UniProtKB/Swiss-Prot annotation:
NCBIfam families: PRK04435.1. It comes from the Bacteria. This is UPF0735 ACT domain-containing protein SERP1207. InterPro entries: ACT-like_dom_sf, ACT_dom, UPF0735_ACT_dom-cont. It comes from Staphylococcus epidermidis (strain ATCC 35984 / DSM 28319 / BCRC 17069 / CCUG 31568 / BM 3577 / RP62A). Gene3D superfamilies: 3.30.70.260.
Length: 151
């Protein structure tokens, strides 16, 4: 079995990444946005060694860049149990131009419930972060977490 078959992938927040990995992302972005920029100049601009850049450049990608083809992800929303809460969430999903693939609402316990949504964002230009922020702004939504995505 090829070693590539055994690779695991993780979703990790940017603030816990090593500085060299973050700089690698910045260098990649600079190179993508300026075709005249050389790798030498880009790593120099961000104070990153070329060896670190070459080590990480094919191993780190922003989440949204990796899901451009599929654009499917699953969120869990923690909500207060009020009449019409699910309708409010579905209305927001529609306004964000997202398609619902699956949906599950838990039985409320102590006036709290969860709504788990698998979504397709092919028709939306929003990033996952923008979707999460929009859903967090709905009244009575107390928390929104990304729990999976298709890559």
């Amino acid at each position: 079995m090829d070693n590539k078959d055994n690779r695991k992938f993780y979703l990790i927040r940017e603030d816990v990444l090593p500085e060299s990995v973050i700089k690698t992302l910045k260098v990649k972005d600079a190179l993508k946005n300026n075709s005249n920029l050389s790798i030498y100049d880009a790593v120099k601009q961000f104070n990153l060694s070329r060896s670190a850049f070459y080590k990480y450049r094919e191993t780190i990608f922003p989440v949204d860049e990796k899901i451009l083809d599929q654009r499917e992800f699953t969120l869990i929303l923690y909500v207060n149990d009020i009449v019409g809460m699910l309708a409010q969430v579905l209305n927001a999903i529609s306004q964000l131009q997202l398609s619902v693939l699956t949906i599950h609402q838990s039985v409320p316990i102590e006036d709290k419930a969860t709504i788990t949504l698998s979504l397709n964002a092919r028709n939306s230009n929003l990033s996952i972060d923008e979707v999460i922020e929009s859903l967090r702004e709905i009244n009575h939504v107390t928390k929104v977490d990304l729990i999976s995505m298709t890559m």
